[in-house]
Amino acid sequence: MIEFIQQYLSSGEEWEKLCNSCYRIRYQEQGYQEIPAKYKGDGGIEGFTKSGIVYQCYCPEKAYTDDELYEHMRDKMTKDVSKFISKDYEPVLKGLGIRDVREWHFVVPEYKDKRILEHAEKKRKEVLEYKKGTVNSVIIYRKILQ
């Protein structure tokens, strides 16, 4: 399995292709929909389901130190969650068919530092406060679906 995944770690685009394929298979019965980033970006969401799952993926551009990897992942999560909870972006989400978000998945090939879990919890609380309880969980997936 590791060898299979390894071929998709060469770029963020390859990682995104793999993640989208996995989400399409896993959530096809829940109406999974990919969001292309070509026109005005994807707003911090790679795809979503009709059941309220949205996800964003991240693949490091190079071999970072543990601290650098944490910083890049933290910054990516912060940036994407900020878009996700922006009042300006709310009409875009609704226009895409995203009504009630129940879960936000951050899919990464690896993480080496518990601080990213602590940061995810901080962001979860931030989203809950903003959305007044409509997002139930923020989940970090490592190596796609553990």
Each predicted region: which residue ranges?
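Acidic metal-coordinating catalytic centers involved in nucleic-acid phosphodiester chemistry
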Residues: 69, 73, 78-146
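Short, surface-exposed loop/strand segments
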Residues: 1-100
